[in-house]
From Swiss-Prot:
Binds 1 Mg(2+) ion per subunit. Binds 1 zinc ion per subunit. Pathway: Amino-acid biosynthesis; L-histidine biosynthesis; L-histidine from 5-phospho-alpha-D-ribose 1-diphosphate: step 3/9. Belongs to the PRA-CH family. InterPro entries: PRA-CH (IPR026660), PRib_AMP_CycHydrolase_dom (IPR002496), PRib_AMP_CycHydrolase_sf (IPR038019). This is Phosphoribosyl-AMP cyclohydrolase. It is an enzyme of class 3 (hydrolase). GO terms for molecular function: magnesium ion binding; phosphoribosyl-AMP cyclohydrolase activity; zinc ion binding. Homodimer. Its cofactor is Mg(2+); Zn(2+). It is found in: Cytoplasm.
């Protein structure tokens, strides 16, 4: 039997884009990257674990903020080069800016307009004890 991870078309850096969506509403919460290890751990631990390109290490979503993403379902697109994680976003905040979604800006009249409110001050999110 073929290893399920071998079916994924990893990019030249060994990564695949991963889109997190709210499992109830379908709203796109964020996009991050996964490597083979992070995807395998996500499936095993049933929580989102990404690969941080800037830090060069595994990133367990919510490890600093407490805003864990509980995995409900993993999906692979038709070209096998994008993953969707259907998640329950604990704390209802996916973005490091304190918003529900990282996609909080809308293109309007030639500029990006902020349309979603900050739910919690990022300084309060990332202070000790969340």
């Amino acid at each position: 039997m073929k290893d399920w991870l071998d079916e994924i078309k990893w990019n030249s850096d060994g990564l695949v884009p991963a889109i997190a969506q709210d499992h109830k509403t379908g709203r796109v919460l964020m996009m991050a990257w996964m490597n083979r290890e992070s995807l395998a751990l996500t499936a095993t631990e049933q929580r989102a674990i990404y690969w941080s390109r800037s830090r060069g290490k595994l990133w367990r979503k919510g490890e600093e903020s407490g805003h864990v993403q509980k995995l409900h379902e993993l999906r692979l697109d038709c070209d096998a080069d994008v993953i969707i994680l259907m998640v329950e976003q604990l704390g209802h905040i996916a973005c490091h800016t304190g918003r529900e979604s990282c996609f909080y800006r809308v293109y309007e009249d030639g500029q990006w307009k902020i349309v979603d409110p900050v739910l919690k001050d990022p300084d309060a999110i990332y202070s000790a004890g969340h």
